[in-house]
Amino acid sequence: IVYHFAAYAAEGLSPFIRKYNYDNNLITSTNLITCSIQYNVSRFVFASSMSVYGDKYKPPFSEDMKQAPIDPYAVAKYAVEMDLEIAFKQHGLNYTIVRPHNFYGINQNIWDKYRNVLGIWMYQLLNKQNPTIFGDGSQVRAFSYVDDSVLPFWNASQKNSCIGEIINLGGIKEHTINDACNVLINVTGQNLKPVHLEARHETKYAWSTWEKSVKLLDFKHQVDLEEGLSKMWEWAKKQPNRERFIWPKYELNKGIYDYWKN
């Protein structure tokens, strides 16, 4: 069995590191699929992304909606999904595509300023910095604590009913970005207010249906946002005070957001 989670998941940065994005998120994935065919892997579980839905549809996004990516990161995920379908039809590689979205929790990378909004805020609050929000904060997401994903991902490789299926995986309660930021500030007890930055190219309202994941993967949303962020904050306070990762040189500077300019 192969679980393919590896990716550089900085979706917002992907338009400015296009080659790096495709080398890491597409080419390496197709190499792994080729090896899986060659060595008769019994199941290939691919962690895709809700980003493949783009901004064409009104949420919640369901698995039967046609992919409509709006950035190179989502294009790479979509291409891998298509390659898996071909590998199944032509070579018999059994696969399951899981489209997780907005998972967070302990051991998450909080030192990368380009991805994982809750981790970004957590780093800022640990360092007594105001949390930053792109745009007006009215964007909507549904967050899930990482522990809630463990059993569903295991079942994705174990159940025959999951072969050849695409399954959303993620939270059942939506939050605006402003609300999520305030929940974290309250959890930390910090007397800091968010700072709003220029809006960026993104899908503003994005969350998915979850019924199929309950039926096929036994998904249960057990940890609410406040409880999950409390656990993550206690973990984060024990971590070393590391420098944040800064991308050394963008492949494309045209249109880069002021906040990311080196």
Predicted regions and their residues:
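Hydrophobic alpha-helix immediately C-terminal to the catalytic Tyr-X-X-X-Lys motif of short-chain
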Residues: 79, 83, 87, 117, ...
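The catalytic Tyr-centered alpha-helix of NAD(P)H-dependent dehydrogenases
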Residues: 69-76, 100, 110, 114-118, ...
